[in-house]
Amino acid sequence: ISGASVYDLPSWYLSISNNSGDSEIWRFESQQWRMSKSLYEDRKGYERNSPSTWVENVTMPVLIWTGEKDPQINPNQSIAFYLALRRLNKKVVFLNYSNESHSLLKKESQVDLYYRFNDWLIYHLKDESPAEWIIKGLK
């Protein structure tokens, strides 16, 4: 299960934050990602840490969710992950929560995601029949 996640580090490195309007470079070079070097000083390091580099190796079904108005991580990161998996004929379902952020704040969305997590895990871990939304999503 992948939620509101980064798929392609180089593209996020070279993007503008929806929150601040500033570059995302600081996250990588001196903060959260702790890369300590620029993309241009350590391209291989960025690629090595980027899920987009390894997407062909995915073997398990993936449930991806994102908030459509996420100011932290552009929802296009989740969409790109989904599209890559679909193109590679991997089993994947994408959930897009409209008018939600990086964290789901609406009770309705939280409950929905909880039940979908539950359905997903029961289907894949307990080998029970899939919920209708899973069947539709995997087509």
Model-derived regions, located:
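Active-site-proximal cap/loop segments of hydrolase catalytic domains
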Residues: 1-139
